[in-house]
């Protein structure tokens, strides 16, 4: 049968974000409302082939990077868009009651495993380090400031993960199943806090 573009085992493996079937999805809860899976019945022969010798249900380094990139892009750009369109005004984060509501919705959407106090601390860090625009009025100047903040957030998350991963595994090549990305807890919570803004103001 046709092999399509005939990708290598490593390339295919890197693209399987949720390496299990729908029937196996309950064994891999992500705390979200819908079940996540990538392996359909027609895919199973190729999936079993590409996972030969791999740890069960594990993702290779390349797939972990893709997964993190997706989380960072989604969290940062959804907040950017919500500010640009007027759906979210960061000034509301100064209201403790509003923060409580956002955190409640975040945990309802992404799961109670996300500690409320740590989510609050993440919001406070991001505000304290001026990673939300103080005033946004749609002007060219404020749009430029928003773009700069977006870039700062992406750089912040990527730098923290790269640093933590290199501190753990050293400077050599990091490929396939030789290593895992290391995401600091504070970074994880900041990403989920941004996702929570999208849940509360956009979803």
Regions found by a protein language model. Give the residues of each.
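Sequence-structural signature of the catalytic-core scaffold of metal-dependent phosphohydrolases
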Residues: 1-143, 154
């Amino acid at each position: 049968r046709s092999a399509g573009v005939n990708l290598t085992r490593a390339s295919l493996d890197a693209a399987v974000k949720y390496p299990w079937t729908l029937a196996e999805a309950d064994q891999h809860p992500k705390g979200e409302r819908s079940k996540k899976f990538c392996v359909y019945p027609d895919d199973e022969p190729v999936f079993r082939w590409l996972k030969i010798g791999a740890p069960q249900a594990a993702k290779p380094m390349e797939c972990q990077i893709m997964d993190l990139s997706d989380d960072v892009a989604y969290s940062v750009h959804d907040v950017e868009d919500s500010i640009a369109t007027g759906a979210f005004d960061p000034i509301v984060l100064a209201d403790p009651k509003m923060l409580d509501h956002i955190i409640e919705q975040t945990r309802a959407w992404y799961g109670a495993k996300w500690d409320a106090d740590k989510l609050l601390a993440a919001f406070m860090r991001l505000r304290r380090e001026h990673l939300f625009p103080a005033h946004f009025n749609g002007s060219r100047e404020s749009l430029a400031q928003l773009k700069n903040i977006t870039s700062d957030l992406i750089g912040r998350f990527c730098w923290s993960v790269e640093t933590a991963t290199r501190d753990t595994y050293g400077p050599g090549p990091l490929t396939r199943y030789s290593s895992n990305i290391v995401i600091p807890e504070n970074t994880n919570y900041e990403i989920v806090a941004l996702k929570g803004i999208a849940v509360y103001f956009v979803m």
